[in-house]
């Protein structure tokens, strides 16, 4: 009897250790634009990134810290991963936990080039890529390349001051 109880306990513990990560939400260009529009009244930063992108991984701690400090000040952030949709649920969540990312992260559910073209005709699909939206939902700036906490802070402050 004792052996049976130990076997059951071991199987339960083993089962709990292999519970799958929750599935990350998928998005296409239209869905993302609708999500951005739902945040009217806030400044919105959209960050396109991937776990295979060195500069993306380097800037992630700054992005996470920026969001923690600015979410109460009317800033929303949305991360969009270009990781392969088939493996994103295994590769992305550990990176988000390790970097204490609290903002929503979505995974592109279509061809990256098509996504980039539908989201912004001028974007070639490079990452990291950022888009800044004012409180009315208007896109006011787009840029590519590794971005620091100080750069995000300056962009948001400039936008908030110019819209007063």
Give short role names for the model-derived ranges:
Residues 99-101, 108-155:
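Thiol/disulfide oxidoreductase modules built on the thioredoxin-like
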Residues 10-19:
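Hydrophobic h-region of N-terminal signal peptides that target proteins for export
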Residues 161-164:
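Non-globular targeting/processing and membrane-anchoring segments
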Residues 39-44, 73-76, 101-103:
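Loop/turn elements at helix/coil->beta-strand transitions in domains of secreted/extracellular proteins
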Residues 58-99, 111-117:
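Structural microenvironment flanking redox-active thiols in thiol-disulfide oxidoreductases
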Residues 42-44, 48-52, 126:
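Short pre-active-site segment immediately N-terminal to redox-active cysteine/selenocysteine motifs
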Residues 1-7:
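Bacterial N-terminal signal peptides that target proteins for export
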Residues 23-44, 67-70:
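A short beta-strand-turn-helix
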